[in-house]
């Protein structure tokens, strides 16, 4: 029909469509690989930061209940106990992981819940002792602190009871005091003698208590202080640093593997070729010229422009480039043995052997024609 497009235009459109489709697929594949690589690097960065945080940051706070025990084999008619209350607290998580980290200062406190009973108010001051021990039960540290209830007058107690009477009736409040006894203000773990437990003893046989807890709180300084007080900022900086470092490594590896633009290898291969050429010069067999029958063999020596014969022809030829080397043609009936070069880009010329110098009789018998037939090998001066 008249309105139909020409066939070459359709073919051109199909080819352009195939080319564009191929480029689109290639571009999508490249974007997919790039997205997966970035996602993998991000995951590795988060994993590295999490591993560092878990291994570097110790336990911030550890709270362990303290269960006191005492002897009961004495006379029960008295109101006092048979012995001082004693408790043994283990400083290990699940019996394996230690709570304390080497070199980290800790604040160790004992929290006592004491009722405001007349017995406790009449106690006055009493002593609390803690003894830390290591493996085998050996004591490595001991500390003692004195404690007493806070004083409250009779009028203050009556007003407090009237004010919180409704809460006291329904059990939402209690008439008790929570005493916090600081046993260690700066306790540091010894790496050679680790602490495995603590023995707590209250030096009072008439004390009454609801419960007790041993709290260990880490006192951070330096980098640990920043990681604990600014966790989100430190996490962002740490993950970004890891991601940047890994991205640079992957980028340089890709450039070296695909392009080879960072560390080109042609210089190294050039040095290897030069060394192989020098070795071939020293180890190549020398050329032996042979003349036709009826002609006497003569010695061909390299003559420089100054008229001096060089001792090492290979050193002179090594300074010539491929364009400056003269083209050599063999004599009539001459058989040449040219060694193959170690690299195709370098062509080494064979060297002539130095024959023994002729005697005076043979030198005088040489005809002018023979001397004229000798062709000297042109070489460039080393200067």
Swiss-Prot record:
<feature type="glycosylation site" description="N-linked (GlcNAc...) asparagine">
    <location>
        <position position="242"/>
    </location>
</feature>
<dbReference type="InterPro" id="IPR009617">
    <property type="entry name" value="Seipin"/>
</dbReference>
<keyword id="KW-0256">Endoplasmic reticulum</keyword>
<keyword id="KW-1133">Transmembrane helix</keyword>
<keyword id="KW-0442">Lipid degradation</keyword>
<keyword id="KW-0325">Glycoprotein</keyword>
<dbReference type="Pfam" id="PF06775">
    <property type="entry name" value="Seipin"/>
</dbReference>
<feature type="modified residue" description="Phosphoserine">
    <location>
        <position position="345"/>
    </location>
</feature>
<dbReference type="GO" id="GO:1905693">
    <property type="term" value="P:regulation of phosphatidic acid biosynthetic process"/>
</dbReference>
<feature type="region of interest" description="Disordered">
    <location>
        <begin position="279"/>
        <end position="383"/>
    </location>
</feature>
<dbReference type="GO" id="GO:0005789">
    <property type="term" value="C:endoplasmic reticulum membrane"/>
</dbReference>
<dbReference type="GO" id="GO:0120162">
    <property type="term" value="P:positive regulation of cold-induced thermogenesis"/>
</dbReference>
<keyword id="KW-0812">Transmembrane</keyword>
<feature type="topological domain" description="Lumenal">
    <location>
        <begin position="49"/>
        <end position="242"/>
    </location>
</feature>
<keyword id="KW-0597">Phosphoprotein</keyword>
<keyword id="KW-0472">Membrane</keyword>
<dbReference type="GO" id="GO:0034389">
    <property type="term" value="P:lipid droplet organization"/>
</dbReference>
<keyword id="KW-0443">Lipid metabolism</keyword>
<feature type="glycosylation site" description="N-linked (GlcNAc...) asparagine">
    <location>
        <position position="88"/>
    </location>
</feature>
<comment type="function">
    <text>Plays a crucial role in the formation of lipid droplets (LDs) which are storage organelles at the center of lipid and energy homeostasis. In association with LDAF1, defines the sites of LD formation in the ER. Also required for growth and maturation of small nascent LDs into larger mature LDs. Mediates the formation and/or stabilization of endoplasmic reticulum-lipid droplets (ER-LD) contacts, facilitating protein and lipid delivery from the ER into growing LDs.</text>
</comment>
<comment type="subunit">
    <text>Undecamer (an oligomer having eleven subunits). Oligomerization is important for its function in lipid droplet formation. Interacts with LDAF1 to form an oligomeric complex. Interacts with RAB18. Interacts with ZFYVE1 in a RAB18-dependent manner.</text>
</comment>
<feature type="transmembrane region" description="Helical">
    <location>
        <begin position="28"/>
        <end position="48"/>
    </location>
</feature>
<dbReference type="GO" id="GO:0045444">
    <property type="term" value="P:fat cell differentiation"/>
</dbReference>
<dbReference type="GO" id="GO:0019915">
    <property type="term" value="P:lipid storage"/>
</dbReference>
<feature type="topological domain" description="Cytoplasmic">
    <location>
        <begin position="264"/>
        <end position="383"/>
    </location>
</feature>
<feature type="compositionally biased region" description="Low complexity">
    <location>
        <begin position="353"/>
        <end position="371"/>
    </location>
</feature>
<feature type="transmembrane region" description="Helical">
    <location>
        <begin position="243"/>
        <end position="263"/>
    </location>
</feature>
<feature type="modified residue" description="Phosphoserine">
    <location>
        <position position="289"/>
    </location>
</feature>
<dbReference type="GO" id="GO:0050995">
    <property type="term" value="P:negative regulation of lipid catabolic process"/>
</dbReference>
<dbReference type="GO" id="GO:0005829">
    <property type="term" value="C:cytosol"/>
</dbReference>
<protein>
    <recommendedName>
        <fullName>Seipin</fullName>
    </recommendedName>
</protein>
<dbReference type="GO" id="GO:0005811">
    <property type="term" value="C:lipid droplet"/>
</dbReference>
<dbReference type="GO" id="GO:0048515">
    <property type="term" value="P:spermatid differentiation"/>
</dbReference>
<keyword id="KW-0551">Lipid droplet</keyword>
<feature type="compositionally biased region" description="Polar residues">
    <location>
        <begin position="292"/>
        <end position="302"/>
    </location>
</feature>
<dbReference type="GO" id="GO:0061725">
    <property type="term" value="P:cytosolic lipolysis"/>
</dbReference>
<feature type="compositionally biased region" description="Basic and acidic residues">
    <location>
        <begin position="322"/>
        <end position="332"/>
    </location>
</feature>
<feature type="topological domain" description="Cytoplasmic">
    <location>
        <begin position="1"/>
        <end position="27"/>
    </location>
</feature>
<comment type="similarity">
    <text>Belongs to the seipin family.</text>
</comment>
<dbReference type="GO" id="GO:0140042">
    <property type="term" value="P:lipid droplet formation"/>
</dbReference>
<dbReference type="GO" id="GO:0005783">
    <property type="term" value="C:endoplasmic reticulum"/>
</dbReference>
<dbReference type="GO" id="GO:0060612">
    <property type="term" value="P:adipose tissue development"/>
</dbReference>
């Amino acid at each position: 029909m008249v309105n139909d497009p020409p066939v070459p235009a359709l073919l051109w459109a199909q080819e352009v469509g195939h080319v564009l489709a191929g480029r689109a697929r290639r571009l999508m594949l490249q974007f997919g690989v790039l997205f997966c690589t970035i996602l993998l690097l991000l995951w590795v960065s988060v994993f590295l930061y999490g591993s560092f945080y878990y291994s570097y940051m110790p336990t911030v706070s550890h709270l362990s209940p303290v269960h006191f025990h005492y002897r009961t084999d004495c006379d029960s008619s008295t109101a006092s106990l048979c012995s001082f209350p004693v408790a043994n607290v283990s400083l290990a998580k699940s019996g394996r992981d230690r709570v304390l980290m080497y070199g980290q200062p800790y604040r160790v406190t004992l929290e006592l819940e004491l009722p405001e009973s007349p017995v406790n108010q009449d106690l006055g001051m009493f002593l609390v002792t803690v003894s830390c021990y290591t493996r085998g039960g050996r004591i490595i540290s001991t500390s003692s602190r004195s404690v007493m209830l806070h004083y409250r007058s009779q009028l203050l107690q009556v007003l407090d009871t009237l004010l919180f009477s409704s809460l006291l009736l329904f059990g939402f409040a209690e008439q008790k005091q929570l005493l916090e006894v600081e046993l260690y203000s700066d306790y540091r773990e010894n790496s050679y003698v680790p602490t495995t437990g603590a023995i707590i003893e209250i030096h009072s046989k008439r004390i009454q208590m609801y419960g007790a807890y041993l709290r260990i709180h880490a006192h951070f300084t330096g980098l640990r202080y920043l990681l604990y007080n600014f966790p989100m900022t430190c996490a962002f900086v740490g993950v970004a640093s890891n991601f940047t470092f890994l991205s640079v490594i992957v980028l340089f590896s890709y450039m070296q593997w695909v392009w080879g633009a960072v560390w080109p290898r042609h210089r190294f291969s050039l040095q290897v070729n030069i060394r192989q050429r020098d070795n071939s010069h020293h180890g190549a067999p020398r050329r032996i010229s042979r003349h036709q029958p009826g002609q006497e063999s003569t010695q061909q020596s390299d003559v420089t422009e100054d008229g001096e014969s060089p001792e090492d022809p290979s050193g002179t030829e090594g300074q010539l480039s491929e364009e400056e080397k003269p083209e050599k043609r063999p004599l009539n009936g001459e058989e040449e043995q040219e060694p193959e070069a170690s690299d195709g880009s370098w062509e080494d010329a064979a060297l002539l052997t130095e024959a023994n110098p002729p005697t005076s009789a043979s030198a005088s018998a040489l005809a002018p024609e023979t001397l004229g037939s000798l062709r000297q090998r042109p070489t460039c001066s080393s200067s």
